[in-house]
Amino acid sequence: MKKFFALLLALVMVLSLVACGDRKTDDNQGDTNTDDQQGETTTYTNPDDIDDNMTSEDGKYEIAFVTDVGQLKDKSFNQGTFDGVKLYAANNGLSYKYYQPANGDQATDDDRYDAMKAAVDGGAKVIVCAGFMQGTALEKAAKEFTDTKFVFIDGWSLGLDNVAGIAFNEEQCGYFAGYAVVKEGYEKLGFTGGGGGTNPACIRYGWGFAQGANDAAKEMDKTVDLNYSWEYGASFQASPELQTMVSGWYSNGTEIVFACGGSMFQSVAAAASAEDGKVVGVDVDQSSESETVVTSAMKGLSDAAEWAIAKVYDGTWDEIGNAATSLGVAENAVGLPTATWSMENFSVADYEDLFQKVLNGDITIDNNSEMANPAEGGLTNVNVNYIGG
């Protein structure tokens, strides 16, 4: 995953450093300044080494991030995207700031627009907006602020030259996770998703997970069970209700649950810890967050954000502006984390072989963004208990 667009990013980073000249970023401690006291350049590779908040010399912030619902530090979608913003800014001497729409998980389109306007008023030349719920507000803002570039993560083309839609083939990494855990030996699975069954990315994750489990079970001549729920996930938040539901699953025999929805992971991991269950993480490698994590269905959020921002500064924005870019196995933008591999019956070599089959087209994964209920998908080796949302 870290090799995603690596050569391209290396090139645009060099070009951007030349273009940016002597621009610097400063916070109170100087941690995000790319020039040290001897004038040497620091190259950041770990976003955790970069402050979330920085103070620019002129009070303006050139690169902005507008969060999706949920927490900034959700160890998932918001944080993964913001990591790319921080890395590009810090490594190129640019100021950056994040903006959270008012009213939290009850944020309206007006709240999201206000956050984008605040970013523009604060000096933003490029605004990275996370989540499909940003669409209406983003279109309004982009039409009004035509000199500002907008990167729409998990988005689509809005027919505007200053908007780049960046989406992922989540069904592919979801498939890898479902296939892997069944091959590992798990037969009683769960899925709990964010967005109430309306979020296209979460739907693709879950539908891919079910397809992967089905294909693995078919190869093993067995049938597996899958609890499938959109309950308590509309706001992508952790909640006692979600933890109670998933605890009930574990106590009734469910072995592993795919936690697909930002901070919802916290509730699922807590339930797993209490009930001796296991978890599949989402968006980023979440193995460091809980010992219950077996694997994670990942997409290259940080790399994609860096790549898209770079195009603002290297003069190639026209390649992605007024277009929808979809990233998947062909770009090495989705997958499972091999550096923290813990599975024993399904090896890294097995995974790499599976990845290659998908890449070559030997395995076709349906990407229906409306398949919120996999019980309607014609699966032959998965018994789906659909709970809805």
Question: Where are the predicted features?
Answer:
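General helical structural elements
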Residues: 7, 27-28
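Enrichment for repetitive, rod-forming helical segments
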Residues: 9-10, 119
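C-terminal motif of bacterial Sec signal peptides marking the signal peptidase cleavage site
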Residues: 16-19
